[in-house]
Design a protein with these regions (language model features):
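Short secondary-structure boundary/hinge segments and terminal tails
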Residues: 52, 65-66
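Short Lys/Arg-enriched helix C-cap and helix-to-coil transition segments
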Residues: 56-63
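Basic/aromatic recognition patch in beta-strand/loop cores that engages polyanionic ligands
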Residues: 45, 49, 58
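The DNA-recognition helices of helix-turn-helix-type DNA-binding domains
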Residues: 51-52, 76
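Structural signal for short hydrophobic segments within the conserved structured cores
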Residues: 26, 54-56
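Basic Lys/Arg-rich amphipathic helical interaction modules
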Residues: 1-46, 66-77
Length: 77
């Protein structure tokens, strides 16, 4: 395999590690997703309320794991 070739699993793992190092978190909230995507707050809230978006409820907050977020991004280009 050429060193420039990566499979999807490797790319997802690298992106999860990059975001984890940048934000110091394993879960993203609305504000984090706004920073990452550049979307507005209302659009991110709509996205987080979409049943197809991989959120988890912790207490009264909706969050998404970094891994699920990155996988979702790759599957929804």
């Amino acid at each position: 395999m050429n060193t420039n070739e990566f499979n999807t699993k490797d790319l997802i793992e690298m992106e999860v590690n990059r975001l984890s190092n940048k934000y110091g978190k394993d879960y993203l909230d609305c504000e984090d997703i706004i920073k990452i995507t550049g979307l507005g707050r209302n659009n991110v809230r709509t996205l987080m309320n979409n049943p197809k978006f991989p959120t988890t409820i912790i207490g009264r907050r909706k969050v998404v794991s970094l891994t699920n977020f990155v996988v979702w991004q790759f599957n929804n280009k």
